[in-house]
């Protein structure tokens, strides 16, 4: 196993979780070598004073340089167009350092979340990478042939498109899911059980698999079936930060400019580039 991927999960609940304490925790995780942090407000539902996850992600993008920022699921009733617009905008704000936890359900019996992911990915591809030319002399803002309608008609969603945001810096922000059911649609799969790792690798060989860190932070397992670990952080003074920062052979991934590069994930081609090549 190469140097494992490390993703911190951060509790953003209640009055103790101020913007200052959250910022300090994320910056401490960045200094300790974490590859990303999951800005998770799911446990904060109904807690007075909690932060909205996408707003918090945007704020953290302004005060960090290297660490990836994975935003928790948006409300279930959000339309795919709004989800794609918010997540694409966040990726632009963070210069390609974001991810989206599309679902925390371990099953998708109705296929709704799988369809949502497919539609959102399609909307991210509305503009080719070179669509915007900003040519003031010729009065040309974008190349019309580089704009694509989605025209999706499915069981749960009918979405025409196109999205009114340029293609994200990563092509697609990193898509994360929990559990094996949606692994084939994801880039990053968060599992609870190591026993699921082999089957996920078979159905989604392109994806990176993370398991909860099973023991002391200074002893990262070398024989794990996963590509890395999730680590729950309590704050900037969590002892796990010092232990991980001091570990021998700690990789330096600061040269990576996007979260995809940090995780070893390829930048996806646009579906339109693939069909017209």
Curated annotation (Swiss-Prot):
Top-rank taxon: Bacteria
Signal sequence extent: none
Gene3D superfamilies membership: Luciferase-like domain (3.20.20.30)
Could you list this entry's UniProt keywords, alphabetically sorted. Answer: Flavoprotein, FMN, Monooxygenase, Oxidoreductase
List the protein's name.
Answer: Pristinamycin IIA synthase subunit B
Kindly state the subunit structure of this protein: Heterodimer of two subunits, SnaA and SnaB.
* Cofactor(s) named in the record: FMN
Per the UniProt entry, the disulfide pairs are: none
Which gene underlies this protein? snaB
Q: Name one GO molecular function term.
A: monooxygenase activity
Q: Which Pfam families match?
A: Bac_luciferase
The protein's role, per its UniProt record: Catalyzes the oxidation of the proline residue of pristinamycin IIB (PIIB) to pristinamycin IIA (PIIA).
UniProt key word Oxidoreductase: yes
């Amino acid at each position: 196993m190469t140097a494992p991927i490390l993703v911190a999960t951060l509790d953003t609940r209640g009055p103790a979780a101020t913007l200052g304490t959250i910022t300090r925790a994320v910056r401490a995780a960045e200094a300790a070598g974490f590859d990303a942090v999951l800005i998770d407000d799911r446990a904060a539902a109904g807690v007075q004073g909690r932060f909205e996850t996408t707003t918090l992600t945007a704020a953290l993008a302004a005060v960090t340089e290297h660490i990836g920022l994975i935003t928790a699921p948006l409300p279930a009733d959000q339309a795919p167009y709004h989800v794609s617009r918010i997540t694409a905008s966040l990726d632009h704000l963070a210069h390609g350092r974001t991810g989206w936890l599309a679902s925390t359900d371990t099953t998708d019996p109705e296929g709704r979340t799988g369809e949502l992911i497919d539609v959102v990915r399609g909307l991210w591809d509305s503009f080719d990478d070179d669509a915007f030319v900003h040519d003031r002399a010729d009065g040309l803002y974008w190349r019309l042939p580089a704009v694509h309608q989605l025209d999706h008609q499915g069981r749960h969603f009918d979405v025409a498109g196109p999205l009114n945001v340029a293609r994200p810096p990563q092509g697609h922000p990193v898509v994360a899911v929990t559990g094996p059911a949606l692994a084939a649609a994801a880039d990053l799969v968060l599992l609870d059980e190591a026993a699921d790792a082999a089957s996920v690798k078979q159905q989604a060989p392109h994806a990176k698999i993370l398991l909860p860190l099973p023991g002391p932070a200074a002893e990262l397992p070398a024989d794990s079936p996963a590509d890395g670990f999730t680590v729950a952080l309590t704050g900037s003074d969590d002892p796990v930060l010092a232990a991980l920062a001091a570990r021998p052979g700690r990789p330096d991934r600061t040269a990576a400019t996007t979260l995809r590069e940090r995780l070893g994930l390829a930048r996806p081609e646009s579906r339109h580039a693939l069909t017209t090549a």
